[in-house]
Amino acid sequence: MKKIGLFGGTFDPIHNGHFHIARAFADEIGLDAVVFLPAGGPYHKDAASASAADRLAMVELATAEDARFAVSDCDIVRESATYTFDTVQIFRRQFPSAQLWWLMGSDSLLKLHTWKKWQLLVRETNIAVAMRQGDSLHQTPRELHAWLGNALQDGSVRILSAPMHNVSSTEIRRNLSAAGVSDGIPPAAARYIRKHGLYEK
């Protein structure tokens, strides 16, 4: 059975921390592919600084060197707010026999009960969780206790051994704006940023 990983984010800009966790995601779950999903209008996130077209282009350039990585614009072409359940449904229809895995940070896991149709979502996809520094499963709200306990036991939720890399897109944008410093950004994305003058004051 084909295993497909789904990795959503604003990617504003895409940085090495994203690649660190995407590779761990692929390796630990044994994925055939990881699909990067740049957000259009994400419901649970602040607005992005770069345009959707620029963020998509940066992700496409940065992921081109790893054959396991693919990119989809399905969240961008939807003009309304995008919800994870709707995105997963797109891939479920496209790959009806595949095993889907959604990658999320532990901060998102701890708020999963606030997501649209979360109880239906977890029937459609498995979940891989990258723990953020300071987070613990002991913080899981009671609304998720029963489900998470069962899911950890049956393997439909996996906690990755690699933690979420402590890299901040906000800090990277600040460094780019203040000094043009592109540390932590894949070279192809850094070249695109310089060429198009993104994140300048």
Curated annotation (Swiss-Prot):
It catalyses: nicotinate beta-D-ribonucleotide + ATP + H(+) = deamido-NAD(+) + diphosphate. It comes from the Bacteria. InterPro entries: Cyt_trans-like, NadD/NMNAT, Rossmann-like_a/b/a_fold. Pathway: Cofactor biosynthesis; NAD(+) biosynthesis; deamido-NAD(+) from nicotinate D-ribonucleotide: step 1/1. Coiled coil: none annotated. Keywords: ATP-binding, NAD, Nucleotide-binding, Nucleotidyltransferase, Pyridine nucleotide biosynthesis, Transferase. GO terms for biological process: NAD biosynthetic process. Its EC number is 2.7.7.18. It is an enzyme of class 2 (transferase). Pfam families: CTP_transf_like. GO terms for molecular function: ATP binding; nicotinate-nucleotide adenylyltransferase activity. Catalyzes the reversible adenylation of nicotinate mononucleotide (NaMN) to nicotinic acid adenine dinucleotide (NaAD). Belongs to the NadD family. This is Probable nicotinate-nucleotide adenylyltransferase. The lineage of its organism: Bacteria, Pseudomonadati, Pseudomonadota, Betaproteobacteria, Neisseriales.
